[in-house]
Regions:
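P-loop (Walker A) phosphate-binding loop of NTP-binding proteins
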Residues: 4-5
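Conserved glycine(s) of the Walker
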Residues: 8-9
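Hydrophobic positions on the alpha1 helix immediately C-terminal to the Walker A/P-loop
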Residues: 12-13
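Conserved substrate/cofactor phosphate-moiety recognition/catalytic segment
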Residues: 17-109
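Short glycine-/polar-rich loops that comprise or flank the Walker A/P-loop
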Residues: 21-23, 111, 135-140
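Acidic, metal-coordinating catalytic cores used for nucleic-acid/nucleotide bond scission
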Residues: 116-126, 146
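A glycine- and Lys/Arg-enriched "phosphate-lid" helix/loop adjacent to the NTP-binding pocket
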Residues: 133-179
Length: 180
């Protein structure tokens, strides 16, 4: 897991490591950009199998999307030939986040090595580390940060409150327990 504030350099760190160590790499920002460019996400490229019912229900049943007011939009998704298709108004960061969560869950089930980026804004990330540890994974958490928030690469995203993180949402003790 590469964790840290937006713009701290998590994606840059990836470029310095061999792909063989990373396994399947999941970055919600890259996922969102790919969806916006093509209108779909190719699920097969992540080495997982799913059904139309399974993947679509991950979105229509997402409490996160429901809380954000995207329940109806989630019902507009379609899945065919391993591709999840998005309408133009749906390919946003919330949907990319749900898709990354879905893929992570599938990778855990088949015990495939994977790496992902996160801002660690939700206790569910600690639960994910605990679940992975119980499944026999060896967890590695790399926290990437800068000395000065003024030099972060993408401060405008935080300013727009797309990924605002509340203070003390996760404690270092919670993270430590999940990684040891």
């Amino acid at each position: 897991m590469f964790a840290g504030p937006n713009g701290s350099g998590k994606s840059v760190l990836k470029s310095y490591l061999p792909e063989s160590l990373l396994g399947v790499y999941l970055n919600p920002d890259e996922m969102e950009a790919g969806i916006k460019k093509s209108g779909y996400a190719d699920i097969h490229r992540f080495g997982i199998q799913t059904t139309q019912e399974e993947i679509l229900s991950a979105f229509t049943g997402s409490k996160f999307l429901q809380e954000k007011g995207f329940f109806d939009a989630a019902r507009s998704l379609s899945f065919e030939d391993g591709r999840l298709f998005f309408t133009s108004d749906v390919g946003n960061s919330y949907f990319a986040s749900v898709l990354v969560d879905f893929i992570r869950g599938k990778l855990l089930k088949v015990r495939q090595t994977f790496t992902f980026e996160t801002v660690m804004s939700h206790p569910g990330k600690v639960a994910l580390l605990q679940q992975a540890q119980q499944a026999g994974y060896r967890n590695y958490l790399y926290y990437v940060a800068t000395d000065d928030p003024e030099i972060c690469g993408k401060p405008s995203r935080v300013e727009r409150a797309r990924c605002a993180i509340r203070k003390n949402h996760l404690t270092l003790l919670q993270i430590s327990r999940a990684t040891h």
